[in-house]
């Protein structure tokens, strides 16, 4: 195994991509590798509060990341600097467990699912309502509703939460079901290890004999030809046997580079749904649920302040809440909006960029083509109205974080498939139509000046 300090740097690098910036900087950035005792990696946390928080909330993620990098199962032990406490390095009992190279699927489904990620703990909003409904339908009737279910969206918006929720629901209602959740990175590493150890059949038996396969971050298969080949056959085997497949990505299948066309087409067999950033009301609801789950007493004005400042994704939103609570605990002061501002000053940009709304787009497009705002929501199909409306839908998809149903609502309650059609039509025309390119450039320049 490589030097433990180099290993820990790699682990931190991977985790930094997976969690919010506030969470990483608050809990993990200042940690250091201490030693390797048997099968236990000992990590130094900056203080007792951080040690306890890391142990209860991040041990599982860290162990998973170490396994993804090294192929070895290591337990993790957190200590604090000797000058803060006389910490005895007692190894957890899990450190004595010997790892099997390829365990049966039933050996790990529950342990691979985060117990906090259930449908009950998922906060539904306009940006994730469709994805939630599709996930619940799949959980209630695996391989009968949508197969595969492909969920895409930015980092920290709830894709992984929904995948784990599906797994929990299936196991709760059918305890004998073989449910496997893993990242595409882990799938790749296990496949490489299987080839190296000359045990490909063990690997295939593990993943081709499950009832539900939940595979996260499929975009990381891009460019890995052998792994794509293996996953292609795994997909076919499961689909032919009516086993449920759920896939997540940060982008839709057609936008994943160097993904084989045969995989891309199979990902499009079922239902593709996106998740977009939560609106203000949803962000406040998320903070309330998180505070209740963790037993935090947070004033409403503080939650409103955090929700107004952090609008990118759920991980950063919850990370900001944790940072405020940690800051309050460490300096022993009551949580107020002023304290929250102080705690978050390093992660909130001083000047937030102007957010373009659908209404902004409709107004500017309407002025450009000399049509009324109400025409965007009307049923008129004349070209003088329909074409600008399609351009506005295209720009709403490109320049806002609104979901397809939300965009459709803002254009007179149109179906999300109408929005998809408009986006695809304008995208195709832009490749050859110089006049349309000119219109779009002028409209976007006006939007920048708002």
Curated annotation (Swiss-Prot):
What are the TM regions of this chain, as residue ranges? none
Q: Give the span(s) annotated as Domain II.
A: 84-111
Start and end residues of each stretch annotated as Domain III, AAA+ region = 112-328
Keywords in alphabetical order, please: ATP-binding, Cytoplasm, DNA replication, DNA-binding, Lipid-binding, Nucleotide-binding
Question: Where are the annotated segments for Domain IV, binds dsDNA?
Answer: 329-450
**Cell compartment(s), UniProt:** Cytoplasm
Any one GO MF term held by the record is: DNA replication origin binding
Source organism's superkingdom?
Bacteria
Q: Which Gene3D superfamilies match?
A: 1.10.1750.10, 1.10.8.60, 3.30.300.180, P-loop containing nucleotide triphosphate hydrolases (3.40.50.300)
Region spans: Domain I, interacts with DnaA modulators: 1-84
Example of a GO biological process term: regulation of DNA replication
Show the CDD domains listed in the entry: AAA, Bac_DnaA_C
Spell out the InterPro entries in the cross-references: AAA+_ATPase, Chromosome_initiator_DnaA, Chromosome_initiator_DnaA-like, Chromosome_initiator_DnaA_CS, DnaA_C, DnaA_dom, DnaA_N_dom, DnaA_N_sf
Q: PROSITE patterns of this UniProt entry?
A: DNAA (PS01008)
Q: Where, in this chain's numbering, is ATP bound?
A: 156, 158-160
Got a GO cellular component term for this one? plasma membrane
For this chain, the family text in UniProt reads: Belongs to the DnaA family.
This chain's function reads:
Plays an essential role in the initiation and regulation of chromosomal replication. ATP-DnaA binds to the origin of replication (oriC) to initiate formation of the DNA replication initiation complex once per cell cycle. Binds the DnaA box (a 9 base pair repeat at the origin) and separates the double-stranded (ds)DNA. Forms a right-handed helical filament on oriC DNA; dsDNA binds to the exterior of the filament while single-stranded (ss)DNA is stabiized in the filament's interior.
Write out the domain note: Domain I is involved in oligomerization and binding regulators, domain II is flexibile and of varying length in different bacteria, domain III forms the AAA+ region, while domain IV binds dsDNA.
Q: How does it assemble?
A: Oligomerizes as a right-handed, spiral filament on DNA at oriC.
The protein's name: Chromosomal replication initiator protein DnaA
Source organism of the structure: Geobacillus thermodenitrificans (strain NG80-2)
């Amino acid at each position: 195994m490589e030097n433990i300090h180099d290993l820990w740097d790699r682990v931190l690098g991977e985790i930094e991509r997976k969690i919010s910036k506030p969470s990483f900087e608050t809990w993990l950035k200042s940690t250091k590798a201490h030693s390797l005792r048997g099968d236990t990696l000992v990590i130094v946390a900056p203080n007792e509060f951080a040690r306890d928080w890391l142990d209860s909330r991040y041990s599982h993620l860290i162990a998973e990341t170490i396994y993804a990098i090294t192929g070895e199962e290591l337990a993790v032990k957190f200590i604090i600097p000797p000058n803060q406490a006389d910490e005895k390095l007692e190894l957890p009992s899990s450190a004595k467990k010997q790892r099997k190279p390829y365990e049966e699927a039933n050996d790990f489904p529950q342990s691979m699912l985060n117990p906090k990620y259930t449908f009950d703990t998922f906060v539904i909003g306009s940006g994730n309502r469709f994805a939630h409904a599709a996930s619940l339908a799949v959980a209630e009737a695996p391989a009968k509703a949508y197969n595969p279910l492909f969920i895409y969206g930015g980092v920290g918006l709830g894709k992984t939460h929904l995948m784990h929720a599906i797994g929990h629901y299936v196991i709760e209602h059918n305890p004998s079901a073989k449910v496997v959740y893993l990242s595409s990175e882990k799938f790749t590493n296990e496949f490489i290890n299987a080839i190296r150890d000359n045990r490909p059949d063990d690997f295939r038996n593990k993943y081709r004999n499950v009832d539900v396969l939940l595979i996260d971050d499929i975009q990381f298969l891009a460019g890995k030809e052998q792994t794509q080949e293996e996953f292609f056959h795994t997909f076919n085997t499961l689909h032919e046997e009516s086993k449920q497949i759920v896939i997540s990505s940060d982008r839709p299948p057609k936008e994943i580079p160097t993904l084989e066309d045969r995989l891309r087409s199979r990902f499009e067999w079922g239902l593709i749904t996106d998740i977009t950033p939560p609106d203000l009301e949803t962000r406040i609801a998320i903070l309330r649920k998180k505070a209740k789950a963790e037993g935090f007493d947070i004033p409403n004005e503080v939650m409103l302040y955090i929700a107004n400042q952090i609008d990118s994704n759920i991980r950063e939103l919850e990370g900001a809440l944790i940072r405020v609570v940690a800051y309050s605990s460490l300096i022993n002061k009551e949580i107020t909006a002023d304290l929250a501002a102080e705690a978050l000053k390093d992660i909130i940009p001083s000047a937030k960029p102007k957010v373009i709304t659908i209404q902004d787009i409709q107004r500017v497009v309407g002025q450009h083509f000399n049509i009324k705002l109400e025409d965007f929501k009307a049923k008129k199909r004349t070209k003088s109205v329909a074409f600008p409306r399609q351009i506005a839908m295209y720009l709403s998809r490109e320049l806002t974080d609104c979901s397809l149903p939300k965009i459709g609502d803002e254009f007179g309650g149109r179906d999300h498939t109408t929005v998809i059609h408009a986006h695809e039509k304008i995208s195709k025309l832009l490749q050859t139509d110089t006049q349309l390119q000119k219109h779009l450039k002028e409209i976007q320049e006006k939007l920048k000046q708002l």
